[in-house]
Amino acid sequence: MKEVCYPFYVLKLLGVEQVVLTNACGGINRDFAPGTLMLITDFINMMGTNPLIGPNDERFGPRFPDMTEPYNLELQELAKHTAEEMGIDYKEGTYLGFMGPCYETAAEIRAFAGMGADAVGMSTVPETMVCNYMGMKVLAISCITNMATGT
């Protein structure tokens, strides 16, 4: 987990203030289809861990960072406007991060759907948490590459 997030600490030290994250993931929402681009508006952390566990380094952020708005609204509006100008279809949704390397079971996918998840994958959530912790603005876009088991 720390290795995945390390580059974002370096980016912060280099002065980067905003990041765009992308991923390929499984669709849970039945209104989505493979090839759908989903603007991530929120996340659910089901990874069983958090990259901020451990001693806090105050140079980067507070001990208990706020995750109320993990994805920057201004960047989302810019992405929406740009997609509309270019005629690119997209959906908005909640991304659920799940620890791999196994894919989810059909029962897990049903549970995740009940929790409000639109898509599921094995990345993006730790990076989002670390970037928010450091005060970086985050935009994240998923490409639905397949429908999750049981959908």
Question: Where are the predicted features?
Answer:
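Metal-dependent peptidase/peptidase-like ectodomains
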Residues: 57-96
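General beta-strand structural signal in soluble alpha/beta enzymes
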Residues: 19-23, 39, 90-96, 120-122, ...
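Active-site/ligand-binding-proximal alpha/beta "capping" segment
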Residues: 81-118
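Zn-dependent metallopeptidase/amidohydrolase metal-coordination segment
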Residues: 122-151
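Metabolite-binding pocket within alpha/beta catalytic cores that recognizes anionic/polar moieties
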Residues: 1-67
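Short acidic/polar active-site loop segments enriched in Thr and Asp
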Residues: 17, 118, 137
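Non-catalytic positions within long, well-ordered alpha-helices that form the structural scaffold/packing
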Residues: 12-15, 113, 132
